[in-house]
């Protein structure tokens, strides 16, 4: 493939990918049949009837078979976005799908514990690999820079800071940014300056410790929340003529969406698990609103319902018009998950038509340059 991955057209602002995982031990124990296959690196073929071999085909920008490794997925889905971030654009990666299909494996992965490069590390997920690539590119560029990260959790429509330094786990509030149309601010959200990928793993581990996890019938350590890991890069060009200065601000949002499974599968028919049912309702409401927002953008409606969920308010700037987006859905091959797999694939098919205009967040601002320069010097 080209170094641009799949994103060959400059104006193709959203791309949709699917990653099919192998049958896991739970599915083998349940004698689950494999009913999903990947053909030609773009097509997902689902056998929807065991009796008469009826199949349905879905086509995406790229489909990854079970044998696809972490490096291959990253090179196609995320690596092309890093160039955009370094040029001062906003980019977003969503991981979407049913609980237990590999979203967290795809986004976070595992720490190999050695000094492997981002191009070769066999286990790292999208978040640490993206930061490794960013640092590599920044080190060889003729710019002064700072890299900051934040890690936000949305649980039952409440916002929590996964990197908060205090023991206070109070809820955060979100406000409209009056200085920038279509942007919101999460008041009090911690932003931490990072310098290398080792720090990133430490910070992510810190965030995971604070993260709310809950058992479901499908995954003993399933997350019942959305998480948003945001990387903001401030870059000051050094190669411009004397008297001219340019600050570029690039942003990469890495969003792990909570499991999209239905309430009955999550065990809510048991009265003791009503909290799980409440979680599912909130999760599905967030995902439904996200779909409605994207539909409104596709159809150019004058009103886009960002405010109908906290998730879409947080991501408003990432969906509105100054960003490139990759959606990677993870799916199970098992016939017992067929309903959820079909729901995921149909949801994704709707999103493929979404296109937005793209605007760089380059800024010529003397006072801002001075502030960033001071931070770089510190």
Swiss-Prot record:
Concerning PROSITE patterns, the annotation shows:
KINESIN_MOTOR_1, KINESIN_MOTOR_2
Protein keywords: ATP-binding, Cell cycle, Cell division, Cytoplasm, Cytoskeleton, Microtubule, Mitosis, Motor protein, Nucleotide-binding
Residues binding ATP are 97-104
Which residue numbers delimit the Kinesin motor domain?
13-354
**Taking the first listed entry, what is the main subcellular location of this protein, grouped into a coarse class?**
cytoplasm
Q: Name one cellular component (GO) term.
A: mitotic spindle
Origin: domain of life: Eukaryota
Any one Gene Ontology BP term: microtubule-based movement
Q: Which cellular compartments is it found in? A: Cytoplasm, Cytoskeleton
What InterPro entries has UniProt attached to this entry?
KIF11-like, KIF11-like_kin_motor_dom, Kinesin_motor_CS, Kinesin_motor_dom, Kinesin_motor_dom_sf, P-loop_NTPase
Family to which the UniProt record says this protein belongs: Belongs to the TRAFAC class myosin-kinesin ATPase superfamily. Kinesin family. BimC subfamily.
Q: What does this protein do?
A: May be related to mitotic segregation.
Protein name as it appears in the record: Kinesin-like protein KLP2
């Amino acid at each position: 493939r080209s170094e641009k991955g799949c994103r060959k057209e400059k104006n193709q602002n959203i791309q949709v990918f699917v990653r099919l995982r192998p049958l896991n031990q739970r599915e083998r124990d349940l004698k689950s049949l494999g009913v999903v296959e990947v053909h030609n690196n773009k097509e997902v073929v689902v056998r929807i009837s065991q009796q008469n071999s009826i199949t349905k085909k879905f086509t995406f920008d790229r489909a990854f078979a079970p044998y696809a490794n972490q490096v291959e997925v990253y090179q196609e889905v995320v690596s092309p976005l890093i160039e955009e971030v370094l040029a001062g654009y906003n980019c977003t990666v969503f991981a979407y799908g049913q609980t237990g299909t590999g979203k967290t494996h795809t986004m976070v992965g595992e720490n190999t514990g050695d000094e492997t490069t981002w191009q070769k590390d066999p286990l790292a997920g999208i978040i640490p690999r993206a930061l490794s690539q960013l640092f590599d590119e920044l080190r060889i560029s003729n710019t002064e820079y700072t890299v900051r990260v934040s890690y936000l959790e949305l649980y039952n429509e409440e916002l929590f800071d996964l990197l908060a330094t205090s023991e206070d786990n109070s809820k955060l509030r979100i406000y409209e940014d009056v200085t920038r149309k279509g942007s919101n601010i999460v008041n009090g959200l911690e932003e931490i300056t990072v310098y290398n990928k080792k720090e990133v793993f430490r910070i992510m581990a810190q965030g995971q410790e604070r993260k709310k996890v809950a058992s479901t019938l499908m995954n003993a350590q399933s997350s019942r929340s959305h998480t948003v890991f945001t990387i903001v890069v401030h870059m000051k060009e050094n190669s411009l003529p004397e008297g001219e200065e340019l600050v570029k601000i690039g942003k990469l949002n890495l969003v792990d969406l909570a499991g999209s499974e239905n309430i009955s599968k999550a065990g809510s028919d048991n009265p003791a698990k009503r909290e799980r049912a409440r979680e599912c309702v909130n999760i599905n409401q967030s995902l439904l609103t996200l779909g409605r927002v994207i539909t409104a953008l596709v159809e150019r409606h004058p009103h886009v319902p960002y405010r109908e969920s906290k998730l879409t308010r947080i991501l408003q700037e990432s969906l509105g018009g100054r960003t490139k987006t990759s959606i990677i859905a993870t799916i199970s091959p098992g016939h017992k998950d067929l309903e959820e797999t079909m729901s995921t694939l149909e949801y994704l098919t709707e999103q493929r038509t979404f296109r937005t205009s793209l605007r760089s967040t380059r800024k010529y601002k003397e006072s801002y340059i001075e502030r960033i320069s001071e931070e770089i010097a510190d």
